Each structure stands twice: as C-alpha cells, then as structure tokens.
Amino acid sequence: MNDERRSASRKPSTAAIEVTDTISGETIGRVGNLSRTGMLLICHRPLNDNALYQLRFRLPDPFGAQSEIETGVHTMWTEQASTDGYQWSGLRIISISGRSAASLDKWLEHGAG
C-alpha cells in the first residue's frame, strides 16, 4: 500500500507479536508493522477482504512488561506473501478502548519493540 494514503506512519515490529482472533480463539498471524490507525498482519490463516475482525495481541514495553491490546479491525486489502501458505493483510483499526490506545501510543513512542 502507498504510504501517502495512510493517516499515520507505521512502525515495524522487531519482536514476534502473535495476533489472536478473539472470536475463534485462533492465533492467525503476527504483526508486521503497526500504527495508531492500522497494521500489517502477516497471516498463516487467510483473512477475507473487506471483513471485520476482533483481535488481541500483547505489546512488549521497554521495561519488560506486556500490554494486552484488543481492537476491532477492518480488512482493507490482502495479498499472497512470497512464502507459501502466508498472506499479508492491511488492517484499519476501527475500535480500540482508551486503555488499549494509551498502551499502543506508549509502545509507538518508545521505539516499538
């Protein structure tokens, strides 16, 4: 996706941040990059285009703790990854609690792990 269409710049994740679909309880992939308004999800289970999902993941903070984030997302696009069995999905965050948003902002501000 062209960066100029994004409302916030994305930060790459250097840690393996596993993402769970809260409805199914299944781990569906990991965070590729993340911003206050969206993320790139590297999926090992395909997501549907133009679909809504409820996701949960834990962000490491600089002090060794982890913050659990729950968010509602909208799939903006999907694309086959170069590795067989994987898909890239561009997700827009459409719902996030104040507490989760504060944790996400802190993670983004402190260098993203």
Model-derived features: positions:
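Short, conserved beta-turn/loop elements at beta-strand boundaries and strand-helix junctions
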Residues: 36, 78-84
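C-terminal output/interaction extensions
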Residues: 13, 82-113
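Beta-strand-rich interaction surfaces with strong enrichment in secreted/lumenal proteins
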Residues: 42-45, 60
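Short beta-strand-centered aromatic/proline hotspots
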Residues: 29-31, 69-79
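Short, Lys/Arg- and Gly-enriched loop/turn segments at beta-strand edges
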Residues: 60-70
